[in-house]
Amino acid sequence: MANRILIDTNVLLDYLLERDPFFEAAKEVILSCINGKAKGCIAAHSIPNMFFILRKDYDAKERREILLNLCKIFDVEGIDKTKLIAGLENENFSDFEDCLQMECAKSYKADYIVTRNVSDYETSEVKAIMPKDYVSL
């Protein structure tokens, strides 16, 4: 059975912006979802964050098209009141956004959070793994 993964915003941006030296591993993670080797998910709050970050490289129409394509490829796990409260009450995370990523991963029943910021997820209930390590599984 395919792994269920939540792909962190930084990995998606590595792919979309072709950031070296991270692009190739990010591409392999995304291709694993497209090819059915993994079931991929992104957190809904990653979409507006990426829309903002990508503004330096793409105009609004291009950003909408790029992000719409991501939403078609991946499942999208939303943030609701329950996840927000759980994130706000969780003092084990220093970064609130990372905690929300973990809450989305839990809700999605993800096996892994694929991220370059593994150290930010030391207290995560879902194992965090680097893209290069994930593609080596």
Predicted features by range, described:
Residues M1-C41, R55-E62, T123, S136-L137:
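Short, well-structured N-terminal submotif of metal-dependent ribonuclease cores
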Residues A2-R4, K106-L137:
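Acidic, PIN/NYN-like endoribonuclease modules and their adjacent C-terminal/linker elements
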Residues V11-L12, N49-M50, A86:
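A general alpha-helix detector
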Residues L16, L88-E91, E125:
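Short, flexible helix/strand-to-coil boundary loops that buttress conserved ligand/catalytic motifs
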Residues I42-S46, K83:
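Short, conserved alpha-helical segments within structured domains
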Residues R63-L84, Y121-L137:
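Short acidic, glycine/proline-enriched helix-loop-strand junctions
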Residues D75-V118:
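Active-site neighborhoods of divalent-metal-dependent phosphate/nucleic-acid chemistry enzymes
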